[in-house]
From Swiss-Prot:
Residues 345-475 form the NTR domain. Residues 157-211, 212-274, 275-324 form the Laminin EGF-like domain. The gene is NTN5. It comes from Homo sapiens. Disulfide bonds join C157-C166, C159-C175, C177-C186, C189-C209, C212-C221, C214-C239, C242-C251, C254-C272, C275-C287, C277-C294, C296-C305, C308-C322, C345-C418, C349-C420, C364-C475. Residues 1-16 form the signal peptide. This is Netrin-5. The keyword Repressor does not apply.
Length: 489
């Protein structure tokens, strides 16, 4: 039993990690001191005798030795042995990289006296973990009469307090990094642990690298110093390459085209589900991030915009898949005679019949001249009605160009109530939009200042001729009529 206990104790000591305390918390650690370099040579005659000196006095000679360590190390001691007693003046210099700059470590003047100084000289850096002599090259300069017989260097790998083991003979030397650091000298954080800036460990604080909060959707992140400052020094990591259709600094919301499934936790691979919007009934492939509701076209309803709403029926148009069901005896606007007794409608409309003489002046005063077909209508607030129209031809453009195809037009509710515009679904109209007032540049507006006349094929040629005259400059100098107010929308 005592033998078994001793073996378990030794095994526990061998497997203990010096970079973590018994509770598993990070702590400052250093690799062991090892022999970095050793140089030995025979002792030749340091300096030749001067031929003119019968007393045999020696001349002063100088020498230097540069050692390349193969990587950065923390030097702990430098031992020098000379061929004869009385070593010369010594200068030790260290450089962090090849080519310098060199930093003076130790300077020893020549020993006075005939016998000289000691045969061996040893330089020690600050003992313990506070050793600060970091170098990859060491230079020894000496002058005088003695020659250098041997030199030895001892030190440890530069791991910045984040490793207790090191492959010192590797080139460059590689530390077995802990505290979620990486690099030959543990000089940076792992790609997934960059929520705090990298710092070297100290005996008072190990400064481990902390993981970024990516909800298990990213394997790497980057450190942002500005976010770290704004957070009061709490967090500065930004997740990169979010997976599983997530996005954001912490991969905490879904990409466009996906929505958050509340039945799954945020760190689940199935936290984001595809919107599955209908390709014809929806305006696009995106949906609400919370509910998954797609943005439907006019008259279309459903979570994925896959059916027509109440009062609408399916059509064959991919751009307007649902049309309002027409009523048997009514149109979109009521005839003027039905409301002729309303005092507000008296002299309100532009009372013109279908016999319109389109002169060049009147053509130029219009905001737009279009041939369009009315498809459907729905209320858009208390003062406006939105019409779905299909523009078939454009004879006069607005300041904001009108394109051919399906789009929306806006009509004041009062103009329809008083019968200023007579519109029937499925019928082609010549739409004359007056430039009176200040039309919304982003919307196609039809009101009482313009006309909506049932289209007649014989109008096409005269309108083409007026269009050519406008392009030739025929509308220059023609002013629009006096403005009048429109309802707010």
């Amino acid at each position: 039993m005592p033998v078994t206990f001793a073996l378990l104790l030794l095994l526990g000591q061998a497997t203990a990690d010096p970079c973590y305390d018994p509770q598993g918390r990070p702590q400052f650690c250093l690799p062991p001191v090892t022999q970095l370099a050793a140089v030995a040579a025979s002792c030749p005659q340091a300096c030749a005798l001067s031929p003119g000196n019968h007393l045999g006095a020696r001349e002063t000679c100088n020498g230097s030795l540069t050692l390349a360590l193969g990587g950065p190390f923390l030097l702990t001691s430098v031992s020098l042995r000379f061929c004869t007693p009385g070593p010369p003046a010594l200068i030790l210099s260290a450089a962090w990289a090849s080519g310098g700059p060199w930093r003076l470590l130790w300077h020893r003047p020549a020993w006075p006296g005939a016998l000289g100084g000691p045969e061996r000289v040893t330089f020690h850096s600050t003992p313990g973990p506070k050793a600060t002599v970091a170098a990859s090259h060491l230079r020894v300069e000496f002058g005088g009469q003695a020659g250098l017989a041997a030199a030895g260097l001892r030190g440890r790998c530069q791991c910045h307090g984040h490793a207790a083991r090191c492959a010192a003979r590797a080139r460059p030397p590689r530390c077995h990094c802990r505290h979620h650091t990486t690099g030959p000298g543990c000089e940076s954080c792992r790609p997934s642990h960059r929520d705090w800036p990298w710092r070297p460990a100290t005996p008072r604080h190990p400064h481990p690298c902390l993981p970024c909060s990516c909800n298990q959707h990213a394997r790497r992140c980057r450190f942002n110093s500005e976010l770290f400052r704004l957070s009061g020094g709490r967090s500065g990591g930004v997740c990169e390459r979010c997976r599983h259709h997530t996005a954001g600094r912490h991969c905490h919301y879904c990409q466009p085209g996906f929505w958050r499934d509340p039945s799954q936790p945020i760190f689940s691979r199935r936290a984001c589900r595809a919107c599955q919007c209908h390709p014809i009934g929806a305006t696009g492939g995106t949906c609400n991030q919370t509910s998954g509701q797609c943005t439907c076209k006019l008259g279309v309803t459903g979570l994925t915009c896959n059916r027509c709403g109440p009062g609408y029926q399916q059509s064959r148009s991919p751009r307007m898949p649902c049309q309002r069901i027409p009523e048997a005896t009514t149109t979109l606007a009521t005839t003027p005679g039905a409301y002729s007794s309303d005092p507000q409608c008296q002299n309100y409309c532009n009372m013109s019949d279908t016999r319109v003489h389109m002169s060049l002046r009147r053509y130029c005063q219009q905001d737009h001249v279009l041939r369009a077909q009315v498809l459907a209508s729905e209320a858009a607030g208390p003062a406006w009605q939105r019409l779905a129209v299909r523009v078939l031809a454009v004879y006069k453009q607005r300041a904001q160009p009108v394109r051919r195809g399906d789009q929306d037009a806006w009509v004041p509710r009062a103009d329809l109530t008083c019968g200023c515009l007579r519109l029937q679904p499925g019928t082609d109209y010549l739409l004359l939009g007056s430039a009176v007032g200040d039309p919304d540049p982003t919307r196609l507006i039809l009101d009482r200042h313009g006309l909506a006349l049932p289209w007649r094929p014989r109008w096409a040629r005269p309108l083409k001729r007026l269009q050519q005259e406008e392009r030739a400059g025929g509308c220059r100098g023609v002013r629009a009529p006096t403005p009048s107010p429109r309802p707010e929308h």
